[in-house]
Structure formats: structure tokens, C-alpha cells
């Protein structure tokens, strides 16, 4: 994923950027790839993590929901003599692609890739004019569908929760007024309206469209739901001693990962306001520090690493728990299938 969408060369809303694997040394240390191990890279992208894992002698099953990434990676498949298998799939389905004996490791790098941002026709960037799309694959509802069809109340919830946008009501009402005259079709069209209606004092640090574009991208691709389901899937697919390593770039994503590992540590609630609960068997144990961030040296070389956070867990022998989405407390956002209904 690309951090800080909206400013300079590292934006999820801007660009261009050159893809450099973030926290690569730290990922490899937590993942511990070695000959004979099967590692699943849930976010193949440009193949940065997969390449390093292969260099350590492990076998790699790499997933990506973007068919262009899978097509671009075929030369890499040919170069590694059968040790790399590429699969067009969302990482929430990673358990479907695990070998029968289970996985030795899973690594997830959450969010949009620099390759997607660099292609104006994908509609991720407000600094590159293109169709208002933002889909990581060709399926499902586009950002234009959301902007042109969602109820104002739904737009406010989407912008506020997924983008942490304080001006969500102002922007949503401006969108409603403008789309009644002419629907939004391009990224620059939407970004221009947001810039027009956002108070000048809000424009100091980042482009005013940054948070709205982030929210739309996360919503269109169900990124938080995908992440949550991938964590549950990894719990099922990892063998005892297997490692789950997750790199996030946004506080919403990091909270989900932190909550998952905390819950799977099996400890009972310590709140004096709740009934005493028995401790559950931990399905994950900590690997290294609870959270690892990029060094100043890496951040200087690769600015997208500044907001990156790595969390990792070691799979125990305890049985996987049931996948319960209520663990994360997601709000009730608009249904993709009922926009404008």
C-alpha cells in the first residue's frame, strides 16, 4: 500500500511512486523463510516480498486480486523453476490455496499498490485524471457508482469512518447538489469539487481530497472486511509454528490487526465491569516486538514506509476459533448492492 494519499510522490491519491518493498528486512526476520517452507504472499503486487522469500529458498504461493499484477508476474514464475505459484484471488480466500499440510507463513501488505496508482485509467489518483473507478479488479461497484448513487447519510458515514474526514457532511451535501445537475465521471471532477467546498484552513498539510479518495477506495474494495477475513483464514491455514506477518499503513487497518492478535492471545478480560471470564487457549503468540515501524534511514529512502506498521504472530497448537466479524466493531455502512435504495 502507499501511505499518505494525497501529497507528493507517495500518495494513494497521487503519484507517481516507485514500488519498493516496505520493512523488507523486518518482514523476513518475522517470517523466517527457509528451504522446504511454504509461504503465502497474500499481496503479490510487484513481487517484492515474494522475490526475497524465494531468495531465502522457500516456496511461495502468491495471491493478488488484480489480474494485471498476475499477468506481470508470469516472467517471475518462469524464472523460479516451479517454486512460485501465482493465483488470481483475494487474500480473504487464502485458506483455499494452502497446501494440505498447512502453511509455514503468511505475509500481507495491506492496501493499494504503486502500480495501480500510476495508471490513470484505474481511477485511484486525484493527481492523474482518469475515470472515477478505484476497483482493484474489474468486478463490483465503482467509486463513481458510490458518489453518484449513495444516499447523503451513507456518504457521510463512509467519509467519516473510512477516511476520518471531519468535513464529511459538507462534502457529501456538495456532492448531492452537484450530481443532480451532472454525474461525476472523473477523478479530477470529484477532487475539484472537494477542493472548492473545503475551508481553506483545512488545506494546509494534505490535498483536501485525500481522505475522501481513501474512504472511497477502502469502501469500493471492502478493504477492511477483506483484511479481517484474511486474518481468520490465516489462523485456519497456518500449521503450528507458522507465522503471520501483516504490514499496514493506516490506523484503521492497524487497529484491526492489533485487535485480532490481542484477542487470539487468549487472555480473559481484565475489566472490573465485566463478569470474570476463563482464559481461552491462545491461537497466536507474539513474534518480537508488538509493533515494528520503519527506521529513519528507511523512511528517507522510501517515504511510503513512514506510516508502515508491522505486527506478527506465531501460530500455536490450539484449534482455530470461529470467524466472528463482530470482534472488530465495524459500523453499519451502506450496502454495495443497495446504493441509492
Curated annotation (Swiss-Prot):
Domain of life: Bacteria
GO molecular function, one term: rRNA (cytosine-N4-)-methyltransferase activity
Example GO biological process: rRNA base methylation
GO cellular component: cytoplasm
One Pfam family hit: Methyltransf_5
Binding, S-adenosyl-L-methionine: 47-49, 64, 91, 109, 116
Intrachain disulfide bonds: none
Localisation per UniProt entry: Cytoplasm
SUPFAM superfamilies membership: Putative methyltransferase TM0872, insert domain, S-adenosyl-L-methionine-dependent methyltransferases
Family: Belongs to the methyltransferase superfamily. RsmH family.
NCBIfam families (UniProt xref): 16S rRNA (cytosine(1402)-N(4))-methyltransferase RsmH (TIGR00006)
Record HAMAP family: 16SrRNA_methyltr_H (MF_01007)
Entry function: Specifically methylates the N4 position of cytidine in position 1402 (C1402) of 16S rRNA.
Full protein name: Ribosomal RNA small subunit methyltransferase H
Organism the protein comes from: Rhizobium johnstonii (strain DSM 114642 / LMG 32736 / 3841) (Rhizobium leguminosarum bv. viciae)
Origin organism lineage: Bacteria, Pseudomonadati, Pseudomonadota, Alphaproteobacteria, Hyphomicrobiales
Amino acid at each position: 500500500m502507499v501511505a499518505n494519499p494525497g501529497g507528493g510522490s507517495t500518495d494513494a491519491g497521487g503519484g507517481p511512486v516507485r514500488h519498493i518493498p516496505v520493512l523488507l528486512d523486518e518482514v523476513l526476520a518475522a517470517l523466517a523463510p527457509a528451504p522446504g517452507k511454504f509461504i503465502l504472499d497474500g499481496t503479490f503486487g510487484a513481487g517484492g516480498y515474494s522475490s526475497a522469500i524465494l531468495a531465502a529458498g522457500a516456496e511461495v504461493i502468491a495471491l493478488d486480486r488484480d489480474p494485471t499484477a498476475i499477468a506481470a508476474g508470469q516472467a517471475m514464475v518462469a524464472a523460479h523453476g516451479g517454486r512460485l505459484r501465482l493465483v488470481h484471488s483475494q487474500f480473504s480466500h487464502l485458506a483455499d490455496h494452502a497446501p494440505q499440510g498447512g502453511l509455514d507463513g503468511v505475509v500481507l501488505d495491506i492496501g493499494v499498490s504503486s502500480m495501480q496508482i500510476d495508471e490513470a485509467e484505474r481511477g485511484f489518483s486525484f493527481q492523474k485524471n482518469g475515470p472515477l473507478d478505484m476497483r482493484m479488479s474489474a468486478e463490483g461497484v465503482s467509486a463513481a457508482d458510490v458518489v453518484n448513487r449513495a444516499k447523503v447519510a451513507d456518504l457521510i458515514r463512509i467519509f467519516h469512518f473510512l477516511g476520518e474526514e471531519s468535513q464529511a457532511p459538507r462534502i457529501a451535501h456538495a456532492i448531492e447538489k452537484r450530481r443532480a445537475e451532472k454525474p461525476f465521471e472523473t477523478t479530477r471532477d470529484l477532487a475539484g469539487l472537494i477542493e472548492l467546498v473545503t475551508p481553506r484552513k483545512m488545506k494546509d498539510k494534505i490535498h483536501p481530497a485525500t481522505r475522501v479518495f481513501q474512504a472511497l477506495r477502502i469502501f469500493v474494495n471492502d478493504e477492511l472486511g477483506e483484511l479481517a477475513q484474511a486474518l481468520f483464514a490465516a489462523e485456519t491455514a497456518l500449521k503450528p509454528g507458522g507465522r503471520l506477518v501483516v504490514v499496514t499503513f493506516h490506523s484503521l487497518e492497524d487497529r484491526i490487526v492489533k485487535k485480532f492478535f490481542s484477542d487470539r492471545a487468549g487472555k480473559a478480560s481484565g475489566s472490573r465491569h465485566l463478569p470474570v471470564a476463563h482464559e481461552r487457549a491462545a491461537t497466536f503468540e507474539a513474534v518480537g516486538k508488538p509493533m515494528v515501524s520503519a527506521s529513519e534511514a528507511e523512511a528517507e529512502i522510501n517515504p511510503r514506509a513512514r506510516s508502515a506498521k508491522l505486527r506478527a504472530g506465531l501460530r500455536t497448537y490450539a484449534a482455530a476459533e470461529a470467524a466472528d466479524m463482530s470482534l472488530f466493531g465495524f459500523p453499519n455502512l451502506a450496502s454495495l448492492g443497495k446504493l441509492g435504495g
